UniProtKB/Swiss-Prot annotation:
Residue ranges with Basic residues bias: 46-57
One Pfam family hit: YnaL
Skewed-composition ranges (Pro residues): 11-35
Chain spans, region Disordered: 7-57
Induction annotation: Expressed during stationary phase (at protein level).
Recorded name of the encoding gene: ynaL
Organism: Escherichia coli (strain K12)
Protein name per its UniProtKB record: Protein YnaL
Length: 57
């Protein structure tokens, strides 16, 4: 019953003006910065013949 009343009332057009400010999206967590290089850098290459994974088998 009340929906019929709302349909009869014309909806006023939005008044052009300042746009509604959109809030900034939540920033994604930044990755950890690279640690300072040690004297012997850790090798991440899997091309080495003797890797820990092969030795563990």
């Amino acid at each position: 019953m009340t929906t019929l009343i709302y349909l009869q009332i014309p909806v006023p057009e939005p008044i052009p003006g300042d746009p509604v400010p959109v809030p900034d999206p939540i920033p994604r967590p930044q990755p950890m910065p690279d640690p300072p290089p040690d004297e012997e850098p850790i090798k991440l290459s899997h091309r080495e013949r003797r890797s820990a994974r092969i030795r563990a088998c």
